[in-house]
Amino acid sequence: LKKNLLLSFFLCLALGPAMAQTNDFKVIGYLPYYRFAYNSQIEYERLTHVNLAFANPDMSGQLSLDGQDPTPVIEAAHQAGAEVFISLAGGALTPAWEAAWEHLMLPENRSAFIHQIMVYVAENSFDGVDFDLEWSHVNEKYSPFVLELRDSMDAHGLPLTAALPGTYRYPDISEEALAAFDWVNMMAYDLTGSWDPNNPGPHSPYSFALNSMFYWQGQGVPKPQLTLGVPFYGYNFGTSPVSSARYATIVGWDPANAWADQVDQVYYNGIPTIVDKTELALSQLGGIMIWELGQDDFSDLSLLRAIDETVNGVTQAEDELPLAARAYPNPLGAALIVENPGPEVLLGRLFDSSGRPLAAAIIQPGTDYQYPTLNLPAGLYVLNLQSGGVQRSIKLVKP
């Protein structure tokens, strides 16, 4: 048979089969105030929670989403059945916001500020509060503030959550403060980025998701109280300085990019990796979290749609998938053979566990392709076949 170049393989690590969706599995999407223009395009019905980001105070404690009106977003999300939280602080405080937080978290100012937070929540019909003070701003004032805010949230019957780094606990977060959160959104992304231009590579690999999960479980947070953060963006290490790229922009270059995690020096999470992480969260955790909704592609290539369909067990009809293709042997031996007896061209790529592409291919109808696998390291691989806008992933094992 005629040999061709092969198309696509994706690394797809999972701890086990996904559980059926439970009523308390959360799909949380952050929406920054500077993305409110996408309000009409976001499918809020695919979310359980929307976190509006970020509200910050002035020196008097008055909160604002940088002057943006959240009402249309709150109404749209509520109409779709999603709860809406206000997320406080964020990772990019202006000097004015930083000064206000330092001032308002002082013991003598704390109670009055928390009262203003509760008024802001009530006035805007928020369903909870997410606290996202980060890095150098997490100091000795953090835990006492969280505990007092927790008391006020309890008095109103509202949940309190936090966004925390994937594998780092700030030293000033006490055991009591950590236990005060209803759940923790693990930011399992930004392993590298624009601040580290000499370290190009995946910023949110599957291995980082696993490490984040194990880390926070080791910190005593129960699995149901952890959500796995996934990125809807990537980093382009081919520019100087290193720039970020929306997922929508990446698939706008070429729709086939939706099935990859790397294009040239741009690293991101495509549909197969997002699906794998969603399956991991379903089987091990309490939910999945998205940063952020405004960077999605609002089409059939939507990452939010891929998450929702994975959570709800939606698959495409069998006759829509390129099921005529065969890949064997599995476990892998000396070579992987992919046969395409069907009428459509198949496309794909081969990646190793670090996201490095191993091969790319087009398999013409009625042909096969053989890829040598004898020297591949032991591990899990995924053959992803794409045809006519649909794709099928086949997990492969190299013993």
Enumerate the predicted regions with their spans.
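C-terminal outer-membrane/trafficking sorting elements
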Residues: 320-328, 332-399
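Conserved, mostly hydrophobic/aromatic
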Residues: 50, 86, 131, 184, ...
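Extracellular low-complexity, Gly/Ser/Thr-rich intrinsically disordered linkers
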Residues: 254-310
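Short, well-ordered coil/turn segments that N-cap beta-strands
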Residues: 25, 48, 80-84, 125-127, ...
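Substrate-binding surface in catalytic domains of secreted glycosidases
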Residues: 28, 59-69, 115, 135-257, ...
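Glycan-recognition patch characteristic of GH18 chitinases/ENGases
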Residues: 21-121, 200-207, 214
